[in-house]
Amino acid sequence: MGCASSKEEVALTPLSDVNAAKEVADLKAQVDQLKRQLASAGQSAAPAAAGAVKGGVVETLFFPDEKLPCRNNRRPGGCKRQHCEYSHTPTSLSRFLDYLGSATRTLDICVFTITNDDISDVVLELHNKGVRVRIISDNDQAHTQGSDIDKFRQAGIAVRQDKTAAHMHHKFAIIDGRLLLNGSFNWTRQAVTANNENVTVLSDPKLIASFQQQFDKLWDMFK
């Protein structure tokens, strides 16, 4: 914000015994003015930054978490156990679940593999509330131990899988067409507590539109 150059412009000149007091007073006035300018610039920058967030990165979540979040603590009434081994404080997964659970109309999921029951439970709850959920996943991963794909199908959620020898390796979700969750994070327990992973939450309309276009393309391709 130009702080360095401003300080350089405030040059000290040799002071004589006669005008020392005046020079010091003038210098103090300049410093006070500079402080007021910096404060004013900071206040005016805040709305601009807020606007940038609305159209860009909302938050980036990093894994692994030290512990899985306590399911009971996320429910009304909280956890009643005296010695609970799960986390009662916000974690990357709990934040992820908050974003995922905020869907009110649509949830489009395009993820390589889904085996994490905490995530699957939120997806099923949204489906039961009437949110239109669509899932695209990898065909090979759907048959691995712990996969929740069959659980989703049995619940009536629309699921499609790739039909090629290559992997469907995306890891993103679109919430109500207003939020995008995207990153390296596979929806597995291993990814939560062991792997170095990331999920970026974005709200940029153009970026979301491009991911929605890709989702719709794959959805039609994997009929």
Curated annotation (Swiss-Prot):
The active site is at residues 169, 171, 176. GO terms for molecular function: endonuclease activity; metal ion binding. Residues 164-191 form the PLD phosphodiesterase domain. The keyword Nucleus does not apply. The chain crosses the membrane at residues 7-24. Pfam families: PLDc_2. Keywords: Endonuclease, Hydrolase, Lipid degradation, Lipid metabolism, Meiosis, Membrane, Metal-binding, Mitochondrion, Mitochondrion outer membrane, Nuclease, Transmembrane, Transmembrane helix. Its main location: mitochondrion. GO terms for biological process: lipid catabolic process; meiotic cell cycle. This is Mitochondrial cardiolipin hydrolase. It comes from Chlamydomonas reinhardtii (Chlamydomonas smithii).
